[in-house]
From Swiss-Prot:
It comes from the Bacteria. This is Adenine phosphoribosyltransferase. It is an enzyme of class 2 (transferase). The gene is apt. The keyword Cytoplasm applies. It comes from Nitrobacter hamburgensis (strain DSM 10229 / NCIMB 13809 / X14). InterPro entries: Ade_phspho_trans (IPR005764), PRibTrfase_dom (IPR000836), PRTase-like (IPR029057), UPRTase/APRTase (IPR050054). The keyword Transferase applies. Catalyzes a salvage reaction resulting in the formation of AMP, that is energically less costly than de novo synthesis.
Length: 179
């Protein structure tokens, strides 16, 4: 069994959630398996081990779990990217595309200094709307977005390709067809 097969086996798939025709990939089972969680984090950070990474930015909410672990492994700071209205200090905000409409995300205006090297982390990339918004937000405040990392890629939905088109290298650990 390959590493990817092993990781895929630790992800629960829930059909028709949150709506009919969607195969929901639930990583809580991977997070609850100490060995799978450790291996996933180790593989996410592997390309940057020994590199100068200043901050890891995690997208709410599962990106906080993974991003915190990745930041720890890289001896980097952690920056939460949150839904609008959830942060107590002065923020910078960016609108992003959802499947039906738009929303806004924000981060503290002083969370990242201009030129700091940042890795973006979330659990899954599908259409890429949220990740694209996060990259734009990070660049708006002057971050050097080194890469974006995800446990799961849904390549049929084109999100990773969208980030590649923005000159952001993408690291994923496994892919599932469909959506």
């Amino acid at each position: 069994m390959t590493f990817e097969d092993d990781l895929q086996a630790s992800v629960r798939t829930i059909p028709d959630y949150p709506k009919p025709g969607v195969m929901f990939r639930d990583i809580t089972t991977l997070l609850g398996d100490a060995r799978a969680f450790r291996r996933a984090v180790d593989q996410l950070v592997h390309p940057w081990a020994g590199s100068k990474i200043d901050k890891v930015a995690g997208i709410e909410a599962r990106g906080f779990i993974l991003g915190g672990a990745v930041a720890h492994q890289l001896s980097a700071g952690f920056v939460p990217i949150r839904k609008k209205g959830k942060l107590p200090h002065q923020t910078v905000r960016m609108a992003y595309a959802l499947e039906y409409g738009t929303d806004e995300m924000e981060m503290h205006v002083d969370a990242i200094a201009k030129g700091e090297r940042v890795i973006l982390v979330d659990d899954l990339i599908a259409t890429g709307g949220t990740a694209e918004g996060a990259v734009k937000l990070l660049r708006q405040i002057g971050a050097d977005v080194v890469a974006a990392c995800f446990i799961i890629d849904l390549p049929d939905l084109g999100g990773a390709a969208k980030l590649h088109a923005m000159d952001v290298p993408v690291r994923t650990l496994m892919a599932f067809g469909g959506h």
